[in-house]
Each structure stands twice: as structure tokens, then as C-alpha cells.
Amino acid sequence: MASQGTKRSYEQMETGGERQNATEIRSSVGRMVGGIGRFYIQMCTEFKLSDYEGRLIQNSITIERMVLSAFDERRNKYLEEHPSAGKDPKKTGGPIYRRRDGKWIRELILCDKEEIRRIWRQANNGEDATAGLTHLMIWHSNLNDATYQRTRALVRTGMDPRMCSLMQGSTLPRRSGAAGAAVKGVGTMVMELIRMIKRGINDRNFWRGENGRRTRIAYERMCNILKGKFQTAAQRAMMDQVRESRNPGNAEIEDLIFLARSALILRGSVAHKSCLPACVYGLAVASGYDFEKEGYSLVGIDPFRLLQNSQVFSLIRPNENSAHKSQLVWMACHSAAFEDLRVSSFIRGTKVVPRGKLSTRGVQIASNENMETMDSTTLELRSRYWAIRTRSGGNTNQQRASAGQISVQPTFSVQRNLPFERATIMAAFTGNTEGRTSDMRTEIIRMMESARPEDVSFQGRGVFELSDEKATNPIVPSFDMSNEGSYFFGDNAEEYDN
């Protein structure tokens, strides 16, 4: 991309930093994950968790959610202004699972938010360390992406449920900053904008007055974030139109849905980073690893290395498959929910199966589930190879793709053909090319029609042996293009409900 020079790397977004050189980036990212690790160790001490309990992913998630809730300024302010029965606005908590007499028991804990903020700051050299908080949000978002389908949300905004490969980061809170914006898919941004426009259609005061001015600024900023994800001039020009609209309405919604569809072939660039559960960083810190000194990258070999050497456990329900539970968490750790399964399988070294074939529900356990029958299992999060995470959508190319998901959003920078179902996608583009965006629409459709099979993405990029930390010997895998590559193919994954 031509504008590469003006962009901050993810890591700079991630750590809120200005331009830094590679070593500075590695050490500031190291400082961030080291802080998460120190915080986790301290929380385990507070709750008197055994080593085994501290490695339980469900306990990790509870602790992560508590610190996110403790720092959620807007929600905390809202809770104080609108007291609701039985909710103490100054406290946060969740389920902690403990091993007692050969059984798992659930204990609900409550903690002062102030106390959690103190522990978090203490673990992060007295700073608020918002980058670390965002990192945890992205890990939760990646876990949601791998676990749930967003069919209902897509349909509600007038989009096609088969566009699920564009929905990365759809459950990220708005406060997740630049690092959060970087990992949001095209569909996620489109959905946020459509929701906003719909509110404006239904509420005449939405764009008016002092509040309306702020709303307008937010609208234009979201438009610019989405524009930055597109790689072709016509798509960007169309985003300018949407942004500059005096009174956004149905025409803009149409344009946005058109753009989302076009992204199935003319892919946007969406960042991918491996964000691991807090307990993994905690384990490494506890074993004496100095993240800041050694440096760390979210997009290189480091997360793979960390997972090779970490033992994480998970609660498992009676009829769930332990290997499937591991796959779900592995995909979440590498933000690979929308990656081609053939690529994921090759890197992981074991077959990665579509969501519909997994015998496992989500990682989190609902409060009404029976603990008597719960068991625990070791998650297998190791990999055979590693690959660099990408921030580009790659060029595109035609292959057979599936009924459920008709495109992929690459996670790993690996040379391959990118599957998509041209006939299915193009069928959506009949009709409307009139109106003020007609020339751009025509141009976009022309580009989609001429996307050629030989345009492989990521020329020459490959996977690497885990011993090859400098990425010197790429192995370019060959994929069997005749079988299925989509994760949400013909799927029955649960819906995500807030």
C-alpha cells in the first residue's frame, strides 16, 4: 500500500506510542504483556488460587473481565447515576472455580473496583496501562469471533449472514481505541455505521445540537477508519461520499451494504494479532521471564513460543470434546476465526474443523450450569509451524467456497489462493447502479468481475519452523483446493448475545 509510511504499526497503536523503532516497539509491547502477567499473579494471590486453578482459562477470563469492568469509566458513571437494585456500582466480581475434594465448585466473588485498579496500576509501574486493557478486550473479542456466529446482527442491519468473514471484532467495546479499530473487520465497521444512521433516521435530534456535533465527529471518524481499510480508490471514494453526506439516510445504508459485499472479493486490510489469556502471561512472568527485556511481538513468533511452553486448563462439560475445545481456544489465541481452515490446519499441525462439526460450546460457563458434572482438561495450544500475522486482505482469487461463509479474511501471511464464491457474491450485485455513486459502483463491480485466479495473495510468504525465529526459511505449503476452507460452513454455531 502506498500509504504504508504514514501508518503506525499495530504495536505502536497497541501501546499508544508514537513512532518507535523495532526494538522500542518490542520492549513496549513486552512491558504491556508483562504488566498483564504481574497483575494476574497478584490477583491469584488475592483469591488464594492454587497453581492449577490459576491456569484455568475460566478463572483467567473472570479476572480479565473484572479489571475491564473496573476501568470502564462510562459504565461506572452510569451505574452511579442510575442505581439498580442489587448492583453495587463500586464492586465487580464473577465466578471463580476451585478444586475441592475431587470436584469443581463455583464461588462468586466480589471485589472493590478501586482495589482492582490499584493492583492493576501497581503491576504496570503506577500507570493506567490502557494498552494492556485493550489487549484483553481484543483477546475476548477473538474468543467471541471463534465461538459465535453473528447471523442475527447481520440480518438486523440488512446484511447477508454469509458475510460473516467480515465481522471480526464485532463485540469489541467502542472504547477500544486505535488498536481496537485496527482489528475490526469491514462488516463490523459497516454495522456500527448503519446502526448510527438508523438512529438518526428515527430520532430527529440525533445529529442536532451540541451532542449532535459530537455524534457527527464520531460518524466521520468511523467513516475514515473504514475508508482506511479499503485498498481500492473506488471503494475509498465511495466512503468519502458516505462521510460527506449532509443527512445520512437510506442511500448511505445502501452504499455501505454495497461496500461490505464488495469486500468479499476486494478485501479490506484488517489487522490480526495473537492476544493470549492473562494466565499465559502470568505463567511466563512467574517462571522468571522478563518480557520487557526480551521484547515481544503480537504478530511474530513470540505468541507461538509462549503457547508451546504453557499449560492451560479448561472446564469441560460432560458431552464436549476436549480436542475441539482446544481448537476453539487456539483459533481465538491467533485471531484465526475467519482464516482458511487449510492454512490453519497446516500451521497447527492437526486438522482444524468447521465450527458446525465441533462438539463444544463456548468457553465460559453460565451461572445456572450444573458444576457436579464438570470435569477439566488440558488445552492443546501448541503448533507445528508459525507464520506472520497479516494486516492486509491479500489479493484475491477465485475458488470454490462454501454455502455458509463465502469468503475468508486471511490471518496468516502465507502464499495461497483465496477462496470465494464468485457466482454467489456477484448475484448480490444485480440492479442498482444508478444514483450519485453510480460510476464508483460500476468500477467496483468491474474490478470484482475481473479478479483473476492467478492473483495469489502474499506472494512467496510461507510458514516457518518454530526453530526459525528470524523467519529465514519460508516453507510454502501447497493446499488441496478441492475441499472446504470456511469455518462457519453450513453452520450451527450459537448466536452471540450480549
From Swiss-Prot:
**Motif stretch (Unconventional nuclear localization signal):** 1-18
Provide the coiled-coil residue spans. Answer: none
Which GO molecular function annotation, any one, does this entry have?
Answer: RNA binding
Q: Which domain of life is it from?
A: Viruses
Alphabetized UniProt keyword annotations: Capsid protein, Helical capsid protein, Host nucleus, Host-virus interaction, Ribonucleoprotein, RNA-binding, Viral nucleoprotein, Viral penetration into host nucleus, Virion, Virus entry into host cell
Chain location of the short sequence motif Bipartite nuclear localization signal per the record: 198-216
Keyword Lyase among UniProt keywords: no
Region Disordered: what ranges? 1-22
Q: How is it modified after translation?
A: Late in virus-infected cells, may be cleaved from a 56-kDa protein to a 53-kDa protein by a cellular caspase. This cleavage might be a marker for the onset of apoptosis in infected cells or have a specific function in virus host interaction.
Question: Which cellular components does GO assign to this protein?
Answer: helical viral capsid; host cell; host cell nucleus; ribonucleoprotein complex; viral nucleocapsid
Q: Which GO terms describe its biological process?
A: symbiont entry into host cell; viral penetration into host nucleus
Job of this protein: Encapsidates the negative strand viral RNA, protecting it from nucleases. The encapsidated genomic RNA is termed the ribonucleoprotein (RNP) and serves as template for transcription and replication. The RNP needs to be localized in the host nucleus to start an infectious cycle, but is too large to diffuse through the nuclear pore complex. NP comprises at least 2 nuclear localization signals that are responsible for the active RNP import into the nucleus through cellular importin alpha/beta pathway.
Q: Cite the record's note on assembly.
A: Homomultimerizes to form the nucleocapsid. May bind host exportin-1/XPO1. Binds to viral genomic RNA. Protein-RNA contacts are mediated by a combination of electrostatic interactions between positively charged residues and the phosphate backbone and planar interactions between aromatic side chains and bases.
Similarity section: Belongs to the influenza viruses nucleoprotein family.
Q: What is this protein called?
A: Nucleoprotein
Species source reads: Influenza A virus (strain A/Grey teal/Australia/2/1979 H4N4)
